[in-house]
Amino acid sequence: IDPPMKGDKTSLDYYKAQLQLKVLDVLRDHYGVDVSDAALREAVERHNRLCRAVTAIGDFRKLENPPITGYEYHVIVLVSQVCPHDLILPYLEETLKELQTRQPEPVFPFRARVVVAGSEIDDPEFTKLLEMCGAMVVADRYCFGGFPGREEIEIREGEAAFDAICRHYLHHNQCVRFMDGGKIDQRHQELLRLVREYRADGVIYESMKFCEFWSYEKVLASHVLQQEMGIPCCTIEKEYNLGSVGQLRTRFQAFVESLEIKKLGTEKEGKL
């Protein structure tokens, strides 16, 4: 698929043509998959049901002392992406019910709350390493993460399901391949929203080695967040496999310490 780099109407029409030719037609002609409007509407409903469950689970991270860790949520998100919806949905809804009664630790066990943004992270051990350094991942805005991607698909009145799906993914998509100014600003505002809603102390921007798109985005976005929004940022580059653990641990520990110092300074100023 050749995805467009803008989100306007021309790009949407091109995107729809690409998906029709290279996805729907292939699924129908070569694999016998039902791609009718009725089948797509049923798939959208399953998708929305899964999104509601995953989003509700993730919302627990907004609490001052969440009953779920960032590592646990990372595993849940990955499972929800690779397992058939009809098989995984009962377990997700069961997990949601369990979390509603699970008692958190008596005292918040982490020293800071952070948002992680950047290239794909499909290894939960990365999140575990970060949380072992004292920073709970309260929001995951990276490839394969929970933001964006868990919004429900809205099918408007009189709209074909296929058109709604294409419109949804093009307009909600915040991949850094989108280079127009509106999309860039949208990504910055999304980070600001996550920091506020999930009460994060800072943002960790990571880019996978040789991922040029996130390497550029990381530089610009970290500058905007720090200089214009006053949000502390830590930027790192990592391998696909979790290597250089010692270096990452040192960076994470130093960032957590800086967040603690800033928090203490803010509290001291508030008492004066």
Model feature map: region roles:
Residues 1-37, 143-144, 149-268, 272:
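Trp/Phe/Arg-rich N-terminal binding region typifying the photolyase-homology
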